[in-house]
Amino acid sequence: MAINPLILLTIFPLFLLLSFTDAGIPRVFSGGSWQTAHATFYGGNDASGTMGGACGYGNLYSQGYGTNTAALSTSLFNSGQSCGACFEIKCVNDPKWCHPGNPSVFVTATNFCPPNLAQPSDNGGWCNPPRSHFDLAMPVFLKIAEYRAGIVPISYRRVACRKSGGIRFTINGHRYFNLVLITNVAGAGDIARTSVKGSKTGWMSLTRNWGQNWQSNAVLVGQSLSFRVTSSDRRTSTSWNIAPSNWQFGQTFVGKNFRV
């Protein structure tokens, strides 16, 4: 059967549009180049002092982040947009305090290291803008440097986050205010935007409340819920109908994660 040329003329431009639209979106997160900064530590031997934090993850043990975590300075934290991002870090250029062989550690951004403007940036105000600084959980700091060092020079780079299981969506709030905590994000690890769809609604954008807590004022009670997450590398993961219509506030639902 012959193909109508008019159909080809209609389809071909659409194909080109879709091709160019998707061309710049990577299949997997590729990370970034090596950069320099400094690192200190906090939270105690068991990292109990790192719980909670400005990303809103709460108990980092039960959420799966463990002790391989970091608080980021203002320039790196980016008003919470870097929450969930993963970094490879190694102690460098300080043979007195760096461990032999300059081993790498991999950490997830879970907190904010606030500036101390009463102190100079090179003597106590380590997290003052515009410095790039990592305040590591103590156990992970000790994997790259000696305790007595206090502060060490490092090299760091963004890397893909490797997580076990799917993206987790914890729904808090009440009937007229939904606060969704999103955790365990693989790939880029961070979240650029997210949206929710009820079984009786279209897709609705959520707004960042703080850290990785995202809010909606829509009434979603009694509807099954789907979620869509887009990370900073523009990849999108859609989790269809993961919350049943009888979901309750405080429950966590697991969706589809990004490929790594």
Curated annotation (Swiss-Prot):
Keyword Lipid biosynthesis: no
First-listed, main subcellular location of the protein, grouped into a coarse class: secreted
UniProt-listed GO biological process terms: plant-type cell wall loosening; syncytium formation
Membrane topology: Peripheral membrane protein
Keywords from the UniProt entry: Cell wall, Cell wall biogenesis/degradation, Membrane, Secreted, Signal
SMART domains linked to this entry: DPBB_1 (SM00837)
PANTHER family cross-referenced by the UniProt entry: EXPANSIN-A15 (PTHR31867)
Similarity remark: Belongs to the expansin family. Expansin A subfamily.
Name of protein: Expansin-A16
Organism: Arabidopsis thaliana
